[in-house]
Amino acid sequence: MSAISPFVAIRRDLHQIPELGFQEFKTQQYLLRYIQSLPQERLQVRTWKTGIFVKVNGTSPRKTIGYRADMDGLPIREETGLPYRSKHEGRMHACGHDVHMSIALGVLTHFAHHPLKDDLLFVFQPAEEGPGGAKPMLESDIMREWKPDIIVALHIAPEYPVGTIATKEGLLFANTSELFIDLKGKGGHAAFPHLANDMVVAACALVTQLQSIVARNVDPLDSAVITIGKIAGGTVQNVIAEHARLEGTIRTLSTAAMQKVKRRIEAIVHGIEVAYECEASIDYGAMYHEVYNDPDLTAEFMKFAKAHGGVNVIRCKEAMTGEDFGYMLADIPGFMFWLGVASPYGLHHAKLAPNEEAIDRAIAFLIDYFSWKGNAE
């Protein structure tokens, strides 16, 4: 068997210890041990909750370039069958954050040995999948002190071949909001439905009616998605359910559409209360800002990537994906791009297995990009 690169090995280590948002204790310790093994002459390392900031001091800094990598996994039971599969039952790096971290460590390693003129700030961010680490990290005292002038991030894209970079100027990812709806009626015996108030029936009606919002209330040219991913109700087959809970997500390409969708959800839920004589409550949970790429920086990046020759550059369409990196881009100019990893299974799938060839190729490309950007006269 051929030897694997050090950063592929790191990815496999990290893949085995996925942790949920703000619980990335093992992950943080693993990263810190590696960072402490690097030359420390130009490094400043500070922790924030389960995240890490690493500043690489430049030789004659005029600006600071930021690079963000997210850290958390998902509550998914892995089904890849890989020898380095998750050791944490019911947890998986099913969104590629293990790949993101290994790439960041590869780039950091190079610049710890070969600093730029400008400063570099590596931001290892917890809780991207929820409840959202970017916004509080952005508001932290450390970020205020070390705030970069520009910031960059990537996300793996299973649908693109290895060697592909995809991005666009302006809006890249959607506004997103979690959605939780609780219904309370009156339970009873299945043989006497007229004496009870069935919340499973109410929940089913609500799911159907929510889909009419996208079909009939949102401008067809202004995309929106309402997905109910989980329904829970009832206790046993012969008891009418007194409670039901719906959990889902809202995604829109504009804040105006998000506001309209929420108004319609509230109106429809109120209608369910009246029609089914029940009580209902709505909680929107975590909300993520749209990812809006700085047009000039993104165009410059795409021009560099095309001239580089080592990657295939695609100008992609905006996606309904949610990413809390949008909060950082709302405050700091920068951009995000897709990195092709050629997997037959998509993000958040229990069998997602990114092609690891993408790791070293991404490291080499980002070293070239940051060297060009951070040494420019």
UniProtKB/Swiss-Prot annotation:
Gene Ontology terms describing biological process: diaminopimelate biosynthetic process; lysine biosynthetic process via diaminopimelate
Superkingdom field: Bacteria
Keywords, sorted A to Z: Amino-acid biosynthesis, Diaminopimelate biosynthesis, Hydrolase, Lysine biosynthesis
A GO molecular-function annotation: N-acetyldiaminopimelate deacetylase activity
Classification via CDD domains: M20_Acy1_YkuR-like
Homology family: Belongs to the peptidase M20A family. N-acetyldiaminopimelate deacetylase subfamily.
NCBIfam families: amidohydrolases
Name the UniProt record assigns to this protein: N-acetyldiaminopimelate deacetylase
Organism encoding this protein: Geobacillus kaustophilus (strain HTA426)
Lineage summary: Bacteria, Bacillati, Bacillota, Bacilli, Bacillales
